[in-house]
């Protein structure tokens, strides 16, 4: 009868909202939560209420829906017990491993991809990531170990509305001609720009009509982006949302 979302925006894909809710005239109630469940041996009704900016139910806004089923969708967290057990560093934002341009973790020879790395929207992204991780793992096996102390490493820094990036670092000697960087934002945005900085120099400004936490974004970095005008290597790539 209805979908209640605690946040003031949807965490799902727009096309899923259209195909699963709007096409069937199912209302999406943003900033709402379940406050009561009726029934003894089984569910007979559910009461929801609007919440304030702190997520607390607002008295007087309750709506009761007679129903026999309550489905809870509590989000996804990457399963990484195996990763943690072998010493892989995990991101406090995604719950998945922190990886470099090769999708390699801090434990040499251990690679990560798919939903164990970060939750994906589309299987196309998962497939592409898996292909890249497999190719990089094979390359590692054939090439042997690398001396990370001698690597020129560029840090990728999420700023101003960007919650995280994958990868988090780029080893310049392992970078291809281009590098895809995936990220998510922390809230809904309209008519903004995604700005890419090499240290303090603006490289590109990409206009975005809409951005939402439920939809993964990506940018493409080029090898020339990693070199400053004076010929020295860039130390940091910063990705930020600017209004």
Report each predicted region and the residues it spans.
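Short, aromatic- and glycine-rich surface loops/edge beta-strands on solvent-exposed regions
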Residues: 181, 194-196, 224-243
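Aromatic sugar-binding surface patches on proteins
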Residues: 212-223
């Amino acid at each position: 009868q209805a979908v209640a979302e605690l946040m003031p925006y949807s965490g799902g894909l727009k096309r899923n909202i259209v195909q699963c809710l709007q096409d069937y005239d199912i209302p999406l109630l943003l900033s709402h939560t379940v406050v009561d469940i009726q029934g003894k041996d089984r569910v007979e009704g559910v009461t929801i209420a609007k919440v304030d900016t702190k997520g607390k139910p607002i008295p007087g806004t309750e709506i009761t829906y007679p129903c026999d089923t309550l489905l809870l969708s509590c989000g996804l967290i990457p399963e990484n017990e195996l990763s943690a057990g072998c010493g892989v560093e995990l991101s406090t934002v995604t719950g998945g491993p922190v990886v470099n341009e090769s999708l390699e973790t801090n434990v040499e020879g251990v690679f990560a991809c798919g939903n164990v790395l970060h939750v994906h929207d589309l299987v196309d992204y998962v497939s592409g990531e898996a292909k890249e991780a497999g190719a990089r793992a094979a390359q590692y096996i054939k090439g042997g170990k690398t001396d990370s102390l001698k690597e020129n490493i560029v840090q990728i820094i999420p700023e101003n509305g960007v919650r995280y990036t994958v990868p988090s670092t780029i080893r310049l000697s392992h970078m291809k001609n281009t590098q895809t960087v995936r990220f998510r934002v922390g809230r809904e945005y309209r008519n903004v720009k995604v700005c890419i900085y090499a240290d303090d120099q603006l490289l590109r400004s990409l206009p975005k009509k809409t951005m939402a936490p439920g939809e993964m974004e990506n940018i493409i970095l080029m090898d020339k982006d990693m070199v400053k005008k004076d010929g020295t290597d860039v130390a940091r790539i910063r990705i930020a949302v600017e209004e």
